[in-house]
Regions:
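Metallocofactor- and cofactor-centric catalytic cores in central/energy metabolism, strongly enriched
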Residues: 2-104
C-alpha cells in the first residue's frame, strides 16, 4: 500500500554550504527497513528533480532508526549567496515527507 513517507517518519533538514541535509527518523523501529528499501538516493534525486543538481548521498544510522541524506548542489550556491526563498534548505525535509512509499 502506498502512503506518504510522513506516515512512518519525521524529518529535520538544514544546510552546509550548497548542500542540503535531511535526517529521516522513523517513529517505530519496525519501520526502519521500509525507509532503507524505499528512500533510496535515486528516488530522492528523482523526487526533487531539478532542485538537486549534484549527487545524493545516504548514510544509515540503524541504532537511531534513521538515515541522513546529503543533497549536493541543491541550494543555489548556499545561504549567503543564494536568491532562493529557502537558501538554508529548511523545507527539504517537509517536502520529502510527501514522497509516496510502499508500506507493508
Amino acid at each position: 500500500m502506498k502512503k506518504p513517507l510522513g506516515t512512518i517518519a519525521h524529518t529535520r533538514s538544514g544546510d552546509k554550504g550548497d548542500t542540503a541535509n535531511i535526517g529521516v527518523i522513523v517513529f517505530k523501529p519496525e519501520h526502519y527497513p521500509i525507509i532503507l528499501r524505499e528512500v533510496t538516493t535515486a528516488r530522492v534525486k528523482a523526487f526533487f528533480g531539478d532542485l538537486v543538481k549534484g549527487e545524493v548521498e545516504r548514510f544509515e544510522l540503524p541504532n537511531l532508526g534513521a538515515i541522513n541524506l546529503l543533497l549536493h548542489e541543491s541550494l543555489g550556491g548556499g545561504g549567503t549567496v543564494s536568491l532562493r526563498v529557502d537558501a538554508q534548505g529548511k523545507t527539504f525535509g517537509a517536502a520529502l515527507l510527501r514522497m509516496e512509499i510502499e508500506v507493508d
